[in-house]
Every structure is written in C-alpha cells, then in structure tokens.
C-alpha cells in the first residue's frame, strides 16, 4: 500500500444497527456510548506498535499500601521476562499450597526460550495445566529460570519456593 503524505485522523465509532441474524431486525442502540482510542506512530510492522497497544489497553493501576515489613527494595523488579513478546498473564498463590503460580503467553508466534528472573531462589519448577494439575517437573531452579515456550503457547508453571 502507499503511505498517505498527509496526516490521517478519523475518530469514528463504528457500530452495527442490524441484528447479526440474516433476517434479523434493525434496532436502536439507545443510551450513552463511549469509547477511547490512543494515537501514536511507529515504524512499519506490528511488533513496533505492540507494546504501545498493550500499554494503552491495559493501564497500570497503583495502590499504595503501608509497608508491613517486606524486604524487596523499591528499585528492584518482582519479576522480569527476557522477551518483550512473552506476556505474564497470571501470577498468584497456588490453590493447593503456598507456592507461586505464573502463566506465560507467547505472543509473537515463534518457538523460543525465555528467561524469567526473580529476586528469590526457586527450588523447583513444575509445568502444570490451566487448573494447576502438575504435568512435568522441569530441571530448572535458582533466581533465573530458562523456560521453553512454543509458538502461541499458554504455559502455566508452579514455582516451588
């Protein structure tokens, strides 16, 4: 496609006013409707706009709490992932014990090996299914966990502390 040599901005809310059934009726969408959109420019390719799109659609909400004796310094991350196209989609306490569950989603469509870095030692990593049933114990431990992800994979891991 050719690039426009002029700025293009068209903020139109598209909506359908006809039922999705082939013989469906027309209907009115009464009430107040609102939408938001974010505008930016980036180099060609979806990978260049992906971080902005994710950040725009998932704002970061901070809730300040009183420190109750935690030892993690304010300058450190709780968790780092080496690949920008691997999403941490879940982090929580395991249902059956006091260990940590993380769920990673590979967003780029490529098989890859990533590194998850934590500020504490992990004794063992166990791959689980979505309902935390243990599937496979991995030969991984320490503060840096090297994990393999398949293309478009959604993997859940139990981190034994």
Predicted ranges, named:
Residues 1-161:
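Terminal accessory/anchoring regions of large secretory-pathway or extracellular enzymes
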